[in-house]
């Protein structure tokens, strides 16, 4: 699971290493599942993939039960992933709707793993949305090469939107236990640098 997250989200992977082993393990399982669903949309390559995916899915369900993830989060995430099967070019409205599942729901799951109360969900969604938007900016050329256009060519609009959502999300930082805030702050710093390099 650790290896999958390192490959799938190396920026965030580097940041989470400060967290306790139990939290890291659960986050690895979460991100492995996110990757599996993404790969399912792209297609199954082999019987080996199916066996590996089954293990990932089983471990994710253990994490989901442990933290009582809401069914709506999973539905929104799956909906966003399967949107990629038929929608290749997004407007601002459809991109933000995509973020609802691809990143906002993941933000809520992360918040539960970190021990945050439901009151933190609004801020977790804003932070997840911010991260997704700046990832779209960073990966623009790669996504275009795959036939996807999540954002328009004027990246300054999306960089501003990233900053606005990051600021809003950070208003809920106090919901995260103080000893667990470091990796979030480190991730923010990394993504802010991406924004500065892209602006």
Predicted ranges, named:
Residues 1-131, 137-199:
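Catalytic cores of Mg2+-dependent Asp-rich isoprenoid enzymes
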């Amino acid at each position: 699971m650790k290896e999958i997250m390192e490959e799938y989200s190396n920026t965030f992977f580097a940041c989470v290493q400060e967290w306790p082993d139990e939290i890291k393990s659960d986050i690895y399982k979460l991100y492995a599942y996110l990757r599996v669903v993404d790969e399912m949309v792209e297609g199954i390559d082999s019987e080996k993939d199916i066996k590996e995916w089954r293990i990932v899915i089983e471990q994710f369900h253990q994490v989901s039960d442990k933290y009582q993830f809401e069914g709506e989060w999973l539905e929104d995430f799956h909906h966003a992933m399967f949107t990629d099967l038929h929608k290749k070019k997004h407007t601002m409205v459809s991109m933000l709707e995509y973020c609802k599942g691809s990143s906002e729901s993941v933000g809520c799951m992360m918040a539960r793993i970190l021990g945050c109360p439901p009151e933190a969900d609004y801020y977790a969604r804003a932070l997840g949305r911010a991260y997704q938007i700046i990832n779209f900016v960073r990966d623009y050329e790669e996504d275009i090469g795959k036939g996807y256009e999540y954002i328009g060519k004027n990246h300054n609009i999306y960089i501003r939107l990233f900053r606005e959502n990051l600021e809003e999300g950070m208003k809920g930082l106090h919901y995260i236990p103080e000893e667990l805030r470091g990796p979030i702050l480190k991730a923010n710093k990394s993504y802010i640098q991406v924004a500065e390099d892209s602006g």
